[in-house]
């Protein structure tokens, strides 16, 4: 089968790889000059299935009000003048109940755990290298309230059989030796030893090369204008003056997916703006060895070979990609507070990207009401974590195979109501 994939981020490239491995003739189209040059370029570097959780959580609405008055708040909201933004935020609020949080987190962990299994198999099969580490993830708590609040996450981890360790301040150094110097600032930590880290952009670039070796064609610097529709099906992709035709089409355009398919259906994927800095390591003993999550500031600090990546925060501001100095200040403050002297933040590069987020946190993967159109988008902050599993799942669906995990609650249909032949957003 001929398959066209729109988007060459980590999700699109993973989809291409698994589809090609299944025997399909795959073409990837992207406006950028190469793979992973947008949202996948400088993310936090985490592969964290156990920390797969929706931003829509109990207590978040009240926290959001509090964060409005804090200098280093992890969340900021600025109205972008669109009705869609207001609808999306309302849908997100509807998912902040304990019941919805448990459902959403459960299916996110399911996909993320499966994706890690797919990544491990990929690594065993191909030997792909991307500055990867398997030292786990350590979530740090700065207050007793945060530590107590982790109980609901631990319950979900137990139910999903995800290994974890609850560490006292004195035990944190066993996972991250450099934290011994700052343990007095912390009340404890939750460690997931099965999590991994690495450079997502490097991973995506090398996976694209592997996909090319399987026959995948990458068409970069190519405009993606619209979907051509005929007889209730997709007849092609309009790319400038050319129409590219296939048997099946996959939309993996991240935050841009919503506008691209708006004439066919309304999907609630909104850009959640995040930031990162990448600093050279100057003192190995003072640097992290894997990934640390600061629960207070919602910031991840990740070790690469000779670099430290610090990323996080969320701004609901539309498609604004302006770099804001105050956000860099927060990232530098966080890493220097926990790992003083480990990296030279004065020499750090500064980046921002738009994560494609759904109101319930779960990505949209699978079939759509249009028979030959498939979606693989809306992974939020977990694009790399879920990429391999999403790609394999999509390849199975397109190939007519039963996926290895439950997939019906991942499709766009959880958000669509059929009304007189039209589709409109519904609550997940």
From Swiss-Prot:
Job description of the protein: Oxidative deamination of D-amino acids.
Q: What is this protein called?
A: D-amino acid dehydrogenase
Needed cofactors, names only, are: FAD
Q: Which UniProt keywords apply?
A: FAD, Flavoprotein, Oxidoreductase
Which pathway does it take part in? Amino-acid degradation; D-alanine degradation; NH(3) and pyruvate from D-alanine: step 1/1
In alphabetical order, the GO MF annotations are:
D-amino-acid dehydrogenase activity
GO:BP terms for this protein? D-alanine catabolic process
Q: Which Gene3D superfamilies match?
A: D-Amino Acid Oxidase, subunit A, domain 2, FAD/NAD(P)-binding domain
**Which EC number(s) does the record attach to this protein?**
1.4.99.-
The cellular component terms of Gene Ontology attached to this UniProt record, alphabetical and capped at eight, are: cytoplasm; plasma membrane
**InterPro entries found in the cross-reference section:** DadA, FAD-dep_OxRdtase, FAD/NAD-bd_sf
Entry similarity comment: Belongs to the DadA oxidoreductase family.
**Enzyme class label:** oxidoreductase
Which residues are connected by disulfide bridges in this protein? none
Can you state which reaction this protein catalyses?
a D-alpha-amino acid + A + H2O = a 2-oxocarboxylate + AH2 + NH4(+)
Query: Which species does this protein come from?
Result: Burkholderia vietnamiensis (strain G4 / LMG 22486)
